Amino acid sequence: MSRTIILIPVSTGVGLTSISLGLIHSLEQKGTKVAFMKPVSQPSTGEDKLDRTTSIIRTSTSLETAEPFMLSVAESLIGQNQSDVLLEKIVANHQQLTKNNDIVVVEGLIPTRKHGYANSINYEIAQALDAEIVLVAAPATETPTELKDRVEAAASLFGGKNNPNLLGVVVNKFNAPVDESGRTRPDLAEIFDSFQHNHISETEVNKLFAGSAIKLLACVPWNANLIATRAIDLVKHLGASIINEGEINRRIRGITFCARSLPNMVEHFRAGSLLVASADRPDVLVAAALAASNGIEIGGILLTGGYKIDAQINKLCRPTFEKAKLPIFRIEGNTWQTALSLQSFNLEVPVDDKERIENIKQYISQHFNADFINNLVADSSRLPRLSPPAFRFQLTELARAAKKRIVLPEGDEPRTIKAAVLCAERGIAECVLLADPASVQRVAEAQGVKLGKGITIINPADVRENYVDRLVELRKAKGMTETAAREQLEDTVVLGTMMLEANEVDGLVSGAVHTTANTIRPPMQIIKTAPGSSIVSSIFFMLLPDQVLVYGDCAVNPDPTAEQLAEIAIQSADSAKAFGIDPKVAMISYSTGTSGSGADVEKVKEATRIAKEKRPDLLIDGPLQYDAAVMEDVARSKAPNSPVAGKATVFVFPDLNTGNTTYKAVQRSADLVSIGPMLQGMRKPVNDLSRGALVDDIVYTIALTAIQATQ
């Protein structure tokens, strides 16, 4: 029996879309199958078009959603006194969602001046769907006590404490910036420095609702990073022409109007700042070029007045702007007109801003009461599935519990520093950055991040000598001398490996700059393979829309023998199990069963036999073609008696060419997130990054490494 939760906003401006996304993410992290519906579309423009939440969920997830009724259709039926007809149609849509989902999250209508009927319709929808009600509120000009009173007044419209289906309230956006009248600003003005902030502690809010009949289910503090828009969004809003595209998706975290003399403005030339200046201010352009050349990621430059950049200044600055990928755009209006236009910019998250959507999901989900979420999923009649959000959540939780220390040899690389900061903030691991502390601090400031607790910076020059004797001892048989050892320890990967060998750290992650060979070679020479392992292999975790699959080996072994392939299969199955995936191993080939022949097929057959013999406890079958392994209808015709075909979770490829090609084809064609490669078979955990790795990729690789260190 599925459950239905309806989120009902107490007023406008409560951040309803964000709360919907966060709640859904919290439920998915528990492995619950969730669906979403907005019974009546209510876009902020008032037009008849799809609402923002449904659009976001359809473009960023694979969740089942209902088609909402357009506002004009709903209003027409309400106006003709046919609310019952509208409700019947809503119930029909809802019933379709309950068939295959554990929980249906419903988003209610927002009460506005134009939609004064919203609360009565929300109540009728909640009744019709037998939905449990969660109110969503945000402080406006009230004190905490006044907010509580307003929530309780709103709750009374839905039966208050006498309604067992009224679960409680989510308080969002507390301590948001307000203008002089005390109003929360829903536009770009929120990121100007001129607005005041309330200073209410979360403890105050919790204490206040502790004495209320309405339970506090989540208390979400204001987070300015969640409204950091992209340069391209401002370009579209202003109708600006692009002079230098650069990283047009770069985040804008503040605005500086360059109307003063340069000495009075230069402190605002910082990461994420949008500099608004007349194009006839060459001093601003030159200063911005200098800042960019020093690694400061300015958010962008907006030139006003319609002037063209002076040719000599353009010639001087353009190479720096292009190298720094600094977005520069121009509009015809003057600075005053531009300021007015920026004030009208709506900061609702764009449907295509996947990074911001993901950040909102993660942030909001962290603030839900754990007991509330656990109680929602406790009655689920289906077996939990390991969805991608559930897998990522599990990685984070396991890494937190592990409390490991991970060394990052590329300690002053910008993405690595950002990842280390995130790991520290989330408690994923203590990161050790190997780099000159001054260099790390300089890069961190340029990136706009703060290095806090949970990060250790070690200057390689200060500690290299500590490992010379041990390296000579370990590699003496290979002719290692003190001079050669000192030279090798200049390589921070070698230095990090020696720290790992000495048990000073628990794992190593590298590869954002180094090649795979440079990352793996020192650990192979110094750490060596684990007992019982003859080779090192790798796997990728492929995060499909509704499940997580394991692909191996896609990164290390070019052409493994049958014995090695069997070992890769066993390693991959054990890794899958360690990370919560039930291993059903498919040995992939170009033929299924006995339908083909040749050396490659025979190798897979033999590898399957060896793996089954060594580990009879594992479900392993092969050779299987990829479609037979993954698709149930194909499996029924090609391998009807296979215990794995059609439901494989671990895919073992016969060689690196096949594995790497398949991994990249599936990842790119389906626009999937993958985590890895994760190395298997090492005595201590070492993991390689792609040189194109994103910050999140590095974070999850650090988490994987921390978890491996416990095994």
UniProtKB/Swiss-Prot annotation:
Chain positions covered by the region annotation Phosphate acetyltransferase: 390-711
Catalytic activity entry: acetyl-CoA + phosphate = acetyl phosphate + CoA
InterPro entries named among the record's database cross-references: DRTGG, P-Actrans_bac, P-loop_NTPase, P_AcTrfase, P_AcTrfase_dom1, P_AcTrfase_dom2, Phos_Acetyltrans/Butyryltrans, PTA_PTB
Recorded family membership: In the N-terminal section; belongs to the CobB/CobQ family. In the C-terminal section; belongs to the phosphate acetyltransferase and butyryltransferase family.
Pfam families membership: AAA_26, DRTGG, PTA_PTB
Catalytic activity, EC: 2.3.1.8
Designated name of the protein: Phosphate acetyltransferase
UniProt subcellular location: Cytoplasm
Molecular function as annotated in GO: phosphate acetyltransferase activity
Disulfide bond positions: none
Keywords: Acyltransferase, Cytoplasm, Transferase
Provenance organism: Haemophilus influenzae (strain ATCC 51907 / DSM 11121 / KW20 / Rd)
Enzyme class: transferase
